[in-house]
Structure formats: structure tokens, C-alpha cells
Amino acid sequence: MPTSVTASSSWSQILEMLLEGQNLPEVEATALMEAWLAEQLTPVQTGAFLAALRAKGVTGNELSGMAQVLRGACPLPCPLPDIPMVDTCGTGGDGADTFNISTAVAFTAAACGANVAKHGNRSASGKVGSADVLEGLGLQLKAPLVSVVEALVEVGVTFLFAPAWHPALVNLAPLRRSLGVRTVFNLLGPLVNPLQPNAQVLGVAKAELLNPMAEALQRLGLQRAVVVHGAGGLDEASLEGANAMRLLENGHLRQASIDSAELGLTRAPLQALQGGDLATNQAILSAVLQGGGTAPQRDVVALNTALVLWAAGLQDDLQAGVSTAKTCLQEGLPWQRLEGLRMALDHQIGE
């Protein structure tokens, strides 16, 4: 049963709070999300709330309250695996048109020993999303949900196609598309992995999102996490300069930064990481995971993989993490993980 808005707070009063720049208590953010999922708000009300939240700027409390509702609405086909897990899902929206870096990182981190539950979707902007490129490489997006979970245990990596796990959001999709702007739902995507990993590397396209996203992960109970805003505005750690970070460890947040040059990597502009259409991004991802691609492409994957290995508790030294990732890439081990996942899901589809 959806939570009722408190007697003193009607929907119009909550909207007025947002329009005046006031932050919502977590309980009211929770009630708002529950009302959305229960279709209790009109399209006009929903559009107004989304616009007001975007204009005000979201807080960690608001994000965590909404995320908990969405997590609870996920259809879990089986008990959650009792293993440590890490996700590499970011917010997107940086406009840099890079290749699918976080997707490459997911398979590289798995090859380095992490259990990676990669949450992702198709692109909403006409670019190439993680689901688009993986489907193009033969990965089944419509595999039974239980098979997706089993693949994580079997292969060490899996891909959770967001629409399959969040059916409650289907009714909101047309309105979100009609608004034509990014909303709080774009920020919630990385926070609502159905398998609830205990670690995450989460890239944000804007520096002002570092704190609220990190605070949301903290409130959601993650053990370790990195929220990163890349030099040049990338929603990954980039090779262009100093990358701003918030590190979550044992319930505590701290600021940090890392420059790729400090880890022995050659600086490179964002243009060196450019992707393209689906065929181009498939070719780049295939090449990099098999030890090919350009030096900047491999280096940016190694850099971000090092952050994942830190978050997963596998490597506290980032320099060593970069070295481990480079070795895995040179040996083509990430491609083996992708092939293993593809075969595991194909097997289930065929049964």
C-alpha cells in the first residue's frame, strides 16, 4: 500500500516546497515515488514534480528514499547471491560520445576477480547504451531473470537489463520521453541495481552530483564505493587530468582526486576516447576486451577498473590495480568473460 502523504503536506504543498528550493525529508520523497508507481499522480503533476526536482537539485536523502522504493518493487526471481558484488553503472549524460567505457570495465574487473553485476539500459539519447552494444555482440537481453542471477555466480559477471527488472517504471516512460530532459530517474538508475551490490563505482557527469550521489550510496548501506567526476566532464575517470572523487568506506565519506599521470598512464584528451554508431562501439569494445584497441582506450579502462578493484576490496593500491587490469587486457581475459556470459545466457534461452 503506497505511503500516504502526511496530513500537513498535500501534493500541492510538497510541490510548493520544491519550487521554493526546500529539500524533501526522506519520508516524503518515498511517498512521492510510491505515488508515481501506483499511478496516483496525473501526468501534469508528475511533470511538475520532475521539473521542480531538477531545478532545485536533488539531495542524498531524496535519492535514497526514492531508490529504496524502486529496489523494493523489483521482481526478485530467486534469493540474492550470498557473494560480494560490485556495479559499474553511472548516470550518463556527459555528452562526450565516448565508447562504452563502463561496460568494458565491467568485464575487465570480472577478469581481475571481482563479481560484477552490471546494471544498464539502452541509450535514451540516440547514442549507444550498454544494452545496445552488448546485444549487438550477441548477449541475450531477454534471458530469464533467474538465469541472469545464476550467470553471476557461474561466470563472475552478469548484465541486468533495467526494463526487465523495473516493470513498475514502464508507465512513466512515455512522459519521461516527452519531457525531453534528464530527470531524477536518470540519477536513480545507478542506485537501484536489483541485486543490491555492496560496492560500486558510479560516474557522474556534473561535479555538483558528487555529494548527493555519494550520500545516497552511504544511506543505502554500501560498504565501499567511488563516485567520480572525470576531468573534462566525463562520467568516468578520464585521462585528461585530475578526476574528482568521493570515496565511501565503512560508512564514512571522504574527498579524493586522482590523475592518470600519477599512475603511470599517459594523459590523453577526451577525443581519444570517442565512440560512434553501434557498429563502431561494438568494434572498439571487442578490440579492447581482446587486448587490442588504442593505448588511450586500454588505459582508460585500466584506470576505471582499478577503481572497481578498490571498491570491491580486491586491491587497495590503485597503481597495482592499473597493472592488474592491464595484464588482464593484454591476455584477452575480459573477452573470455563476455563470451562466458553470452554462452551461459544462450544456454538458458535454448532450454
UniProtKB/Swiss-Prot annotation:
One of its GO terms (biological process) is L-tryptophan biosynthetic process. Keywords: Amino-acid biosynthesis, Aromatic amino acid biosynthesis, Glycosyltransferase, Magnesium, Metal-binding, Transferase, Tryptophan biosynthesis. SUPFAM superfamilies: Nucleoside phosphorylase/phosphoribosyltransferase catalytic domain (SSF52418), Nucleoside phosphorylase/phosphoribosyltransferase N-terminal domain (SSF47648). 5-phospho-alpha-D-ribose 1-diphosphate binds at residues 90, 93-94, 98, 100-103, 118-126, 130. Anthranilate 1 binds at G90, N121. Its EC number is 2.4.2.18. Binds 2 magnesium ions per monomer. Its cofactor is Mg(2+). One of its GO terms (cellular component) is cytosol. It is an enzyme of class 2 (transferase). The keyword Glycosyltransferase applies. Coiled coil: none annotated. Catalyzes the transfer of the phosphoribosyl group of 5-phosphorylribose-1-pyrophosphate (PRPP) to anthranilate to yield N-(5'-phosphoribosyl)-anthranilate (PRA). HAMAP family: TrpD. Homodimer. Belongs to the anthranilate phosphoribosyltransferase family. This is Anthranilate phosphoribosyltransferase.
